[in-house]
Swiss-Prot record:
Binding sites annotated in the UniProt record for heme b b562: 83, 182
Its membrane topology: Multi-pass membrane protein
Subunit structure: The cytochrome bc1 complex contains 11 subunits: 3 respiratory subunits (MT-CYB, CYC1 and UQCRFS1), 2 core proteins (UQCRC1 and UQCRC2) and 6 low-molecular weight proteins (UQCRH/QCR6, UQCRB/QCR7, UQCRQ/QCR8, UQCR10/QCR9, UQCR11/QCR10 and a cleavage product of UQCRFS1). This cytochrome bc1 complex then forms a dimer.
Metal-binding among keywords: yes
Annotated keywords: Electron transport, Heme, Iron, Membrane, Metal-binding, Mitochondrion, Mitochondrion inner membrane, Respiratory chain, Transmembrane, Transmembrane helix, Transport, Ubiquinone
Protein name as annotated: Cytochrome b
Keyword Iron: yes
GO BP of this protein: mitochondrial electron transport, ubiquinol to cytochrome c
Residues the record lists as binding a ubiquinone: 201
InterPro entries xrefs: Cyt_b/b6_C, Cyt_b/b6_C_sf, Cyt_b/b6_N, Cytb/b6-like_sf, Cytochrome_b, Cytochrome_b_C_euk/bac, Cytochrome_b_N_euk/bac, Di-haem_cyt_TM
Primary localization: mitochondrion
Organism whose genome encodes this protein: Ochotona himalayana (Himalayan pika)
Underlying gene: MT-CYB
Length: 379
């Protein structure tokens, strides 16, 4: 009798994705972040669902409903802080996952890579709208500043902003629609994840060497199920440590002040995971130019398969490209730091130089270094 997991229509899909999936035998811990992102998405959907049961999306009661969750709901405080810090974990895993894709040349699977970029945009949109919901000072002013950027679009900009606001300023209509979108987007993300995996399983996983590994594959279960479980335990431990010991470490104290349209906070800044993009936005004096640079800071990832000039896929054996990759990482950390600083000397010039270097590295230096490495290897 054939095993049910190989014959049943539904079990067969699960079996081919998680059990009998042929997997390269040498993939390292950097390949753990895909499953960790799945775990983060699951945590966010479950905690978010319970928060939505108690939250009210009205400007008069939103702030107090979040306070009510923390004070009066059974274990509401842990649900709220797991959701808030879960977002930070989500982005840590996202950045590491994308970084791994760049380092090991996984972007050559262009369909998987492009769906991944769509996912990144969707998660960023979800996180932005989620940050508006507690209706604190930074929620309100963050929403005002970021939605206002759309007014830079020629001709339709102003109408577009008012259409998104549902009025002449960020108000009740804006909060209600942001809550609706924040609720639905994670499910759209989950569907996109399925498409992401569908395309990945068409080709199979890449591996650290970047060489086709068809000759040396092992089943996903038990080898990588065990490995992923270890990753889950480490991620949950880190998340719980953050939630239980320092839940407000990554938040902004201004968000504990209810939203007040008449009082602007001294420094409007987004959550830490958007600071690099915010620094790029601020480094260009022109409004439309800044908005374009902001979008391109993520969209530039789509150009990676086109800019790949090396004869090797992975950076594992390419020291010049490795050096440039780590300079890019340092540059992104610099941008993250600059995004949290006030707009004054010397931060302005540092931000402009770091923004220029970010695009210059990806568009010019990395493709040239690959060509040099080809020459050195007489290819």
């Amino acid at each position: 009798m054939t095993n049910i997991r190989k014959t049943h229509p539904l079990m067969k899909i699960i079996n081919h994705s998680l059990i009998d999936l042929p997997t390269p035998s040498n993939i390292s811990a950097w390949w753990n972040f895909g499953s960790l992102l799945g775990l983060c998405l699951g945590i966010q959907i479950i905690t978010g669902l319970f928060l939505a049961m108690h939250y009210t999306s009205d400007t008069l009661t939103a702030f107090s409903s979040v306070t009510h969750i923390c004070r009066d709901v059974n274990y509401g405080w842990i649900i709220r802080y797991m959701h808030a810090n879960g977002a930070s974990m989500f982005f840590i895993c996202l950045f590491l996952h994308v970084g791994r894709g760049i380092y090991y040349g996984s972007y050559t699977y262009s369909e998987t890579w492009n769906i991944g970029i769509l996912l990144l945009f969707a998660v960023m949109a979800t996180a932005f709208m989620g940050y508006v919901l507690p209706w604190g000072q930074m929620s309100f002013w963050g929403a005002t500043v970021i939605t206002n950027l759309l007014s830079a679009i020629p001709y339709i900009g102003t109408d577009l902003v008012q259409w998104i606001w549902g009025g002449f300023s960020v108000d009740k209509a804006t909060l209600t629609r942001f809550f609706a979108f924040h609720f639905i987007l994670p499910f759209i993300i989950a569907a996109l994840v399925m498409v992401h995996l569908l395309f990945l399983h068409e080709t199979g996983s890449n591996n650290p060497t970047g060489i086709i590994s068809d000759a040396d594959k092992i089943p996903f279960h038990p080898y990588y199920t065990i490995k992923d479980t270890l990753g889950f335990l480490l991620l949950i431990s880190l998340l719980l440590a953050l939630v239980l010991f320092s839940p407000d470490l990554l938040g902004d104290p201004d968000n504990y002040t209810p939203a007040n349209p008449l009082n602007t906070p001294p420094h409007i800044k987004p959550e830490w995971y958007f600071l690099f993009a915010y620094a790029i936005l601020r480094s260009i004096p022109n409004k439309l130019g800044g908005v374009l640079a902001l979008v391109l800071s993520i969209a530039i990832l789509a150009a990676m398969p086109l800019l790949h000039t090396s004869k090797q896929r992975s950076m594992m054996f390419r020291p010049i490209s490795q050096t440039l990759f780590w300079i890019l990482v340092a540059d992104l950390l610099t941008l993250t730091w600059i995004g949290g600083q006030p707009v004054e000397h010397p931060f302005i010039i540092i931000g402009q130089l770091a923004s220029f270097l970010y695009f210059f590295l990806i568009l010019v230096l990395m493709p040239i270094s690959s060509l040099i490495e080809n020459k050195l290897l007489k290819w």
